[in-house]
Structure formats: structure tokens, C-alpha cells
């Protein structure tokens, strides 16, 4: 009986360790991905005034 209980605890322990490792790995990767998305958003936000200016220039040329 004791050996069966020990085997059960060891098995659950391995799954718990694996689950914890995968959980923290996924959280870390998601954090990296979020940082990349924030950088992309910043770059696009910086480009927006230039795009707006170009669109206004095109509108002016079309209205002439």
C-alpha cells in the first residue's frame, strides 16, 4: 500500500513540475511577444502622421 501511494505521489509530482515549468515558459514567451507587439504599435504610431500627410497630398493632386 505504501509503495503504491509513493508511486502515485511521484507521478503527480512529475506532472506538477512539468505543468509549472510549462506555465512559466508560456508566461515568459507571452511577455516577450507582448513587448514585440508594443514596439510594432509604437513604430506604426510614429509613421501615422507621415501617412496622413501623404494622403492629404494625394487628395490635393486629385482635386486639381
Swiss-Prot record:
It comes from Clostridium perfringens. Pfam families: Holin_BhlA. May have a role in bacteriocin secretion or immunity. Keywords: Antibiotic, Antimicrobial, Bacteriocin, Plasmid, Signal. The lineage of its organism: Bacteria, Bacillati, Bacillota, Clostridia, Eubacteriales. Induction: By UV irradiation. The keyword Oxidoreductase does not apply. GO terms for biological process: defense response to bacterium; killing of cells of another organism. The gene is uviB. Residues 1-16 form the signal peptide. Disulfide bonds: none annotated. This is Bacteriocin UviB.
Amino acid at each position: 500500500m505504501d509503495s503504491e501511494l509513493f508511486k502515485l505521489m511521484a507521478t503527480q509530482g512529475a506532472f506538477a513540475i512539468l505543468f509549472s515549468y510549462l506555465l512559466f515558459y508560456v508566461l515568459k514567451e507571452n511577455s516577450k511577444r507582448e513587448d514585440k507587439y508594443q514596439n510594432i504599435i509604437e513604430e506604426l504610431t510614429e509613421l501615422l502622421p507621415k501617412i496622413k500627410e501623404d494622403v492629404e497630398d494625394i487628395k490635393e493632386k486629385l482635386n486639381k
